[in-house]
């Protein structure tokens, strides 16, 4: 992901990197290319406009450090704004004591939610936390069976010694759709079993749909009220792009999602969802799925992602070092003024 966007941004910013002096016109010309690159990457249009306006304003008003070329300063501005766009993020799963900590996963059908449940269980198991995974997606009996297979594989093959349990009521699949509250009842009983077993974390795999509809949202809202999860995570397919952001916004409006997990992040998708979802929904990206193995779930770090997008980690480090040196120099000058009584 981001290979195409990284190349286009590199081309746009390279027009500035060799210049000894940069005018406002130079900056605006470069940002037009940046804007085109972001739109082509399927970043939300409103996000792109705000981002480019902020970079231009920052770049024009920024004091250039003596040890940097102006073009390097602009790269630093773009990097900082990318970090702000995707962050701040705290990827740690905040556990409650006494447990269990309840994590509710939701998402559209095909988003990779069931696999992500397994990856999240493996992530927690590897950190010494016992987990129970509960199957509350009852509209498809195969979904319950698949989650059971995934959970047992994590229990047998996952790193760490902590236990991973599976809770399911497969007979309830036949009742699902004929009466309301079936999935809610399963979640309540799963929580009761999790408390009885003494696990640290309960993960609820809820029902998905091919598209967002009111019955789905009402069911999720009912589960939310019934078990009061500590965190609600929305699983979003990174390959879907702009549609993923729109669905994330719809989920967040009804459920107040605490974080987003981007699945299929290792795909050749254009990356627009990663750059848009935080600004559009207010919910930060917590994790990204980077492969098919259970351990392929990574904490999301905006700083690292911004450096990866720009493909200019050395330049960004140079900017940060130069800014630190300027801050130290200013501090020394201030101390000198205070010592000589010249502070005004």
Sequence positions of predicted segments:
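Conserved phosphate-handling catalytic cores of large alpha/beta enzymes
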Residues: 155, 171, 187-190, 195, ...
């Amino acid at each position: 992901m981001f290979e195409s966007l990284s190349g286009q941004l590199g081309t746009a910013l390279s027009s500035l990197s060799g210049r000894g002096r940069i005018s406002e016109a130079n900056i605006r010309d470069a940002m037009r290319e940046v804007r085109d690159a972001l739109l082509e990457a399927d970043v939300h249009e409103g996000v792109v406009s705000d981002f480019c306006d902020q970079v231009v304003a920052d770049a024009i008003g920024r004091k250039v450090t003596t040890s940097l070329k102006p073009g390097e300063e602009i790269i630093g501005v773009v990097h900082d704004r990318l970090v702000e766009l995707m962050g701040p993020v705290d990827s740690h799963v905040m556990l409650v004591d006494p447990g269990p900590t309840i994590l509710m996963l939701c998402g559209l059908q095909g988003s990779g939610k069931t696999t992500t449940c397994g990856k999240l269980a493996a992530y927690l198991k590897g950190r010494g936390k016992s987990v129970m995974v509960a199957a509350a997606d009852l509209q498809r009996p195969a979904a319950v069976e698949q989650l059971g297979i995934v959970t047992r594989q994590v229990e047998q093959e996952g790193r760490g010694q902590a236990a991973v349990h599976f809770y399911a009521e497969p007979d309830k699949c036949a009742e699902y759709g004929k009466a309301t509250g079936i999935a809610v009842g399963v979640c309540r009983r799963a929580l009761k079993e999790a408390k009885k077993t003494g696990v640290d974390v309960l993960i609820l795999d809820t029902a998905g749909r091919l598209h967002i509809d009111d019955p789905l949202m009402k069911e999720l809202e009912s589960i939310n009220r019934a078990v009061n999860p500590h965190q609600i995570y929305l699983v979003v397919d990174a390959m879907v792009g702009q549609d993923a952001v729109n669905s994330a916004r719809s989920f967040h409006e009804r459920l107040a999602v605490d974080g987003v997990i981007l699945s299929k992040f290792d795909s050749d998708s254009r990356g627009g969802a990663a750059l848009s979802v935080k600004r559009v929904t207010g919910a930060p990206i917590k994790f990204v799925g980077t492969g098919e193995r259970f351990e392929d779930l990574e904490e999301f770090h905006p700083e690292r992602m911004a450096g990866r997008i720009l493909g200019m980690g050395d330049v960004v480090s140079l900017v940060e070092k130069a800014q630190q040196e300027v801050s130290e120099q200013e501090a020394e000058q201030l101390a000198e003024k205070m010592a000589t009584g010249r502070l005004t």
